[in-house]
Amino acid sequence: MTKLTARQQQVFDLIRRAIERTGFPPTRAEIAAELGFSSANSAEEHLRALARKGVIELAAGASRGIRLLAGPEDSPHQFTLPHASIMQLSLPLIGRVAAGSPILAQEHISQHYACDPALFSSKPDYLLKVRGLSMRDAGIFDGDLLAVQKRSEAKDGQIIIARLGDDVTVKRLKRRPNGLELIAENPDYENIFVETGSAEFALEGIAVGLIRPGEF
C-alpha cells in the first residue's frame, strides 16, 4: 500500500465518508469547502496526487468522477474495490413517473446514456432526473441525473429514492422508533415522516452516483 501525506489522508477519508454516507463522492468544490482549501483547484491537485499513488481513479470531465481503488498504508479502513470495467454501462433515464406504474416501465424511459462505471460507487440500474431543490445541500440540484441502484432495504443515513403514494421522492433516510423520517437537505423544505408499515411508502432504491448535465 502507498504511504499518504497527512493532507492526502484527509482528502481520502473525506471521499470515503461521503461515499459511505451518500453513495457518491464529493465534488472538488465540496472537498475544498470541507477541508478549508482556497479553491477547487487545490482540491484537484490533491486528487491528482492520490491518483498518481494509485488509491483513487479520476474520470475526466465529471465533477464527481472519483473512485476509490485501495486503502493507503496504515489506514484503518483498508480495502480494495474491483477496477472499473472498460465497458460502458447503458442506463435508462427516467423522467416523470406516472402514478401506480413501475418506475422502469417503458413509458417512463426518455432515453439511454452510455456511462463510465467509474463514476459510481456501485453499479446503478437507472438514472433518475431530479426535480426540485429539496436535496440542494447534499449537492443534488434540479435537473441532475441521480444514479439509482434498485434496493428493497437501505441503511440509516443513505440517500434513497422512494414512492410516497403517487409521488417519487429523493430524501435522506433516518430511522425513528415508530417509523421513518425522510430528511430534506434544504431548510426550505419540510421532512416527511412515514409510520411503520405504511402502505403509502415503498423503497425504490439508493443513490450510488450523480451526473450533472453537460458532463457527457
Swiss-Prot record:
What Pfam families does the annotation carry? LexA_DNA_bind, Peptidase_S24
Query: Which E.C. number(s) belong to this protein?
Result: 3.4.21.88
Please tell me whether the keyword Transport is annotated for this protein: no
Indicate the annotated site residue(s) for Cleavage.
99-100
Assembly, per entry: Homodimer.
Function, in words? Represses a number of genes involved in the response to DNA damage (SOS response), including recA and lexA. In the presence of single-stranded DNA, RecA interacts with LexA causing an autocatalytic cleavage which disrupts the DNA-binding part of LexA, leading to derepression of the SOS regulon and eventually DNA repair.
Q: What is this protein called?
A: LexA repressor
Native species of this protein?
Paraburkholderia phytofirmans (strain DSM 17436 / LMG 22146 / PsJN) (Burkholderia phytofirmans)
Q: Give the gene that encodes this protein.
A: lexA
